[in-house]
Swiss-Prot record:
Tissues where the protein occurs: Expressed by the venom gland.
SS bond list: 31-167, 50-66, 102-260, 146-214, 178-193, 204-229
The protein's name in its UniProt record: Snake venom serine protease
Top-rank taxon, per record: Eukaryota
Keywords linked to the UniProt accession: Disulfide bond, Glycoprotein, Hemostasis impairing toxin, Hydrolase, Protease, Secreted, Serine protease, Signal, Toxin, Zymogen
One Pfam match: Trypsin
Gene3D superfamilies: Trypsin-like serine proteases
Keyword check for Magnesium: no
């Protein structure tokens, strides 16, 4: 019954969530059905939609600003219509049993420490279209080509929604490139700067919480951006997962009092 309600709401969200969500993939193409096995669809029952990343059978990584109500996690999703009609047999749905946000996060700043761990109510089964993604062993270097993916808008500011996840390749830049485009960013930050300087490709409304993948590891989390997506000379900041690996591993190990780096 819960899944039926979720799928019905997803139909409504296809028409309405652009006004309520935060980031999507612009300038990409439909992802290959086999390349997004770790991509989670994070549905918040208040009507907000995010992406997420499966990092082991029981845990999903997403953005802290996606914490806007009770959460359902769908894995193995490709074409939303197939899920809604029951054609897709590889989809698994889980309830968020626990949610963990950095206890030292600034409560009045959604951009601060924008990372959240979701523990699902039961482990997922690894399958053809569901598998976890590795945490980073090292941070990505400037110039790296990385992959973003999600169900977010594919045009901006006039929103077009795809119904399938879209993927795009973007580049890692020095953090100062993002600071030049967004002076409100702090002098130092635990974020990655990524995008295309010419514009035309990037995350946008609806992709929040989704992954920035470099060399088969989750290196970033879609966090926030401008009013119009994928603008020239305006790469976007992504939460830098490498800086939070110790916190992530501590929480998963049962140390729920662990704090994030300042």
């Amino acid at each position: 019954m819960v899944l039926i309600r979720v799928l019905a709401n997803l139909l409504i969200l296809q028409l309405s969530y652009a006004q309520k969500s935060s980031e999507l993939v612009i300038g990409g193409d439909e992802c290959n059905i086999n390349e997004h096995r770790s991509l989670a669809l994070v549905y918040i029952t208040s009507g907000f939609l995010c992406g997420g990343t499966l990092i082991n059978k029981e845990w999903v990584l997403t953005a802290a600003h996606c914490d806007r109500g009770d959460i359902l996690v769908l894995l193995g999703v490709h074409r939303l219509k197939d899920v809604q009609t029951g054609v897709s047999k590889d989809v698994q749905t889980r309830v968020a049993k626990e949610k963990f946000i950095c206890p030292n996060r600034k409560k009045d700043d959604e951009k601060d420490k924008d990372i959240m761990l979701i523990r699902m109510d039961s482990p997922v089964n690894i399958s053809t279209h569901i598998a976890p993604l590795s945490l980073p062993s090292n941070p990505p270097s400037v110039g790296s080509v990385c992959r973003i993916m999600g169900w977010g808008a594919i045009t901006s500011p006039n929103v077009t929604l795809p119904g399938v996840p879209h993927c795009a390749d973007i580049n890692i830049f020095d953090y100062e490139v993002c600071r030049a485009a967004k002076p409100e960013l702090p002098v130092t930050s635990r974020t990655l700067c990524a995008g295309i300087l010419e514009g035309g490709k990037g995350s946008c409304d609806g992709d929040s919480g989704g992954p920035l993948i470099c060399n088969g590891e989750i290196q970033g989390i879609v966090s926030w951006g401008g009013d119009i997506c994928a603008q020239p000379r305006e790469p976007e900041p992504y939460t830098k997962v490498f800086d939070y690996t110790e916190w992530i591993q501590s929480i998963i190990a049962g140390n729920t009092d662990a704090t994030c780096p300042p």
